């Protein structure tokens, strides 16, 4: 099967992770643009270079696209770039000319512009550092009250006008994609929404798109992986098992639906089918939270897993979402008392609940339907998740105040030995901070 993939940007979870997952099946021929063509925290993607890459692809079975990358230069540039609606429209019309020539199924997604409830502008326009929370409040109250919030008198007019204009531009571009969908260009088109609250312009826009026939999904970075999973032929039957069944109606951080609905939605988007335990191909254990989702980096604690966990004698995978962005140490310690044999189909505790679930299900589905199963690639995927989600995010990161590869490498050694023992394979890796910040680390195999 030949699949081409245009990521959101060049972060490890967006670029390296899908490549690693695809390698689990030697029967997948995976086409990925050069990393240098993609954007990062400061630079937008080389859009013309990506257009040329798309033109040069051989005949494919499936094409997975981040439309933000091809329209704006990436997810972050979609919120920052100053180009007008007409400029973006002209660009995506050229993209459409390329796509109509592709005789394959196209799986695409575009983001609904987020509204972060903070004054942190690393991924936003400069003015977010001073006015971000006020803009969030303005959006929230205007939607909730059904009329313009009085906060409009606090935010400088030129800033509010720019923000509203950027939102309107992106929304109108999304409406164009929806027309393409109705014309039959896409097999699947998803409008993603992340950093959601109960009210806000992003929530309104999602409802408008749904009313027009669009499909919206909570999440962002994992959606290309869910679409990759959807492109894999076959329907896998999955039974979710919540380790805290009385709390599955609670809502995860950065999301707007319960963890139970999030799990169901991720299974369906990935081309899976919800099943009961007796009929399931794979069991999905969800280490969910009891009262609220913790957040290790933010110092928000929550009740850790306190029971026993014995792996089943059948295929299973584990979404560890008790904390946002990092493992539940108690649960991992309990998990590691087991033998992770051929029935183990994956573990993830990557960032948000949606991130964890989407990436986990994708890896499991590729393994389940693999025509040429590559065990080494699967083990590399699990090494990456345990070292990133457990060793780094839940432990070593807390000892660092700034990116320091030497300190990171030294701190990871004891965890590497544990992972070697549990996965019964050598761990020979090196680390880097590709975006020069603590938030993400790259695990590279030597």
Regions found by a protein language model. Give the residues of each.
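An N-terminal assembly and electron-transfer interface module characteristic of large anaerobic redox
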Residues: 1-446
């Amino acid at each position: 099967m030949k699949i081409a993939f245009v990521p959101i940007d060049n972060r490890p979870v967006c670029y390296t992770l899908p490549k690693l997952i695809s390698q689990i099946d030697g029967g997948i021929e995976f086409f990925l643009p050069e990393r240098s063509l993609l954007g990062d925290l400061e630079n937008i993607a080389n859009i013309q270079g990506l257009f040329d890459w798309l033109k040069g692809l051989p005949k494919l079975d499936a094409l997975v696209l981040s439309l933000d990358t091809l329209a704006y230069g990436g997810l972050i540039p979609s919120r920052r770039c100053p180009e007008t609606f007409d400029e973006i429209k002209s660009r995506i019309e050229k993209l459409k000319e390329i796509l109509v020539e592709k005789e394959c199924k196209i799986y695409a997604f575009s983001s609904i512009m987020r509204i972060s409830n903070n004054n942190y502008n690393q991924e936003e326009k400069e003015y977010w550092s001073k006015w971000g929370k006020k803009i969030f409040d303005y959006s929230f109250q205007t939607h909730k009250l059904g009329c313009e919030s009085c906060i409009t008198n606090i935010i400088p007019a030129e800033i509010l006008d720019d923000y509203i204009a950027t939102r309107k531009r992106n929304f109108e571009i999304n409406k164009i994609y929806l027309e393409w969908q109705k014309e039959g260009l896409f097999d699947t088109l998803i409008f993603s929404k992340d950093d959601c609250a109960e009210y806000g312009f992003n929530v309104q826009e999602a409802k408008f798109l749904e009313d027009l026939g669009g499909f919206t999904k909570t999440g962002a970075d994992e959606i290309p992986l869910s679409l990759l999973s959807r492109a894999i032929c076959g329907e896998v039957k999955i039974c979710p098992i919540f380790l805290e069944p009385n709390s599955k109606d609670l809502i995860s951080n950065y999301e707007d639906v319960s963890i139970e609905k999030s799990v169901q939605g991720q299974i369906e988007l990935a081309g899976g089918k919800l099943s009961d335990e007796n009929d399931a191909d794979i069991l999905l254990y969800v280490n969910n939270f009891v009262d609220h989702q913790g957040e290790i980096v933010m110092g928000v604690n929550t009740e850790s897993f306190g029971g026993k966990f014995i792996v089943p004698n059948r295929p299973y995978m584990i979404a560890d979402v008790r904390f946002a962005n990092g493992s539940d140490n108690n649960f991992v310690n309990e998990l590691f008392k087991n033998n992770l044999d051929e029935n183990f189909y994956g573990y993830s505790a990557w960032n948000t609940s949606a991130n964890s679930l989407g990436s986990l299900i994708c890896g499991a589905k590729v393994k389940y339907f693999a025509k040429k199963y590559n065990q080494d690639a699967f083990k590399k995927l699990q090494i990456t998740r345990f070292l990133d989600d457990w060793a780094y995010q839940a432990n070593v990161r807390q000892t660092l105040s700034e990116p320091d590869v030497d300190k990171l490498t030294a701190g990871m050694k004891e965890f590497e030995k544990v992972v070697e023992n549990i996965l019964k394979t050598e761990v020979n890796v090196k680390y880097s901070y590709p975006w020069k910040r603590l938030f993400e680390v790259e695990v590279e195999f030597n």
